[in-house]
From Swiss-Prot:
Domain comment, as recorded: A Gly-cisPro motif from one monomer fits into the active site of the other monomer to allow specific chiral rejection of L-amino acids.
Keywords: Cytoplasm, Hydrolase, RNA-binding, tRNA-binding
Organism: Acinetobacter baylyi (strain ATCC 33305 / BD413 / ADP1)
Subcellular location: Cytoplasm
Primary localization: cytoplasm
Record-annotated disulphide pairs: none
GO terms, molecular function: D-tyrosyl-tRNA(Tyr) deacylase activity; Gly-tRNA(Ala) deacylase activity; Ser(Gly)-tRNA(Ala) hydrolase activity; tRNA binding
Purpose: An aminoacyl-tRNA editing enzyme that deacylates mischarged D-aminoacyl-tRNAs. Also deacylates mischarged glycyl-tRNA(Ala), protecting cells against glycine mischarging by AlaRS. Acts via tRNA-based rather than protein-based catalysis; rejects L-amino acids rather than detecting D-amino acids in the active site. By recycling D-aminoacyl-tRNA to D-amino acids and free tRNA molecules, this enzyme counteracts the toxicity associated with the formation of D-aminoacyl-tRNA entities in vivo and helps enforce protein L-homochirality.
Pfam families in alphabetical order: Tyr_Deacylase
Family in the record: Belongs to the DTD family.
Protein name: D-aminoacyl-tRNA deacylase
Motif Gly-cisPro motif, important for rejection of L-amino acids mapped to chain: 137-138
């Protein structure tokens, strides 16, 4: 399971000209699910994201987490994060979780995130989404739970 997290000034997801999720300051998280990923590992990753200190504190250091920064969380499923790219000129998506199974796990992870944090927005699983964001920094990290 991989998460690409970006600190943003604002972000939104649009599907069929409708905004499905929108935040102001916060974290935009692209979430990739692998074949063997489980709910418990996903919960650990969500917990880490929520506690990860990537916002400037009163001293200008990355000392605040999402809650302390009073930010929002925008979760977007992105199976392409699981691609194998070491060989050849075309990504191999074999390591990604099959879509039906991934939707169940993604929905469970969204539900878990909502139970742990007040301001969670999402895209739509497997939809053709347009993601608009204003990066803050830019500050981008890839987190992985095996």
């Amino acid at each position: 399971m991989r998460a690409l997290i970006q600190r943003v000034k604002e972000a939104k997801v649009i599907v069929d000209d409708v905004i499905t999720g929108e935040i102001r300051q916060g974290l935009l998280v692209f979430l990739g699910l692998g074949r063997d990923d489980q709910l418990e590992n996903g919960k650990k990753l969500i917990d880490k994201i929520l506690k990860y200190r990537v916002f400037d504190d009163e001293n200008g250091k990355m000392g605040w987490n999402l809650s302390q920064a009073q930010g929002g969380l925008l979760l977007v499923s992105q199976f392409t994060l699981m691609a194998q790219t070491q060989k050849g000129l075309r990504p191999d998506f074999g390591p990604a979780m099959p879509p039906q199974q991934a939707k169940v796990l993604y929905d469970q992870l969204v539900e878990y995130a909502q139970s742990q944090f007040d301001h969670v927005e999402t895209g739509i699983f497997a939809a053709d989404m347009q993601v608009h964001l204003i990066n803050d920094g830019p500050v981008t990290f890839q987190l992985e739970i095996l």
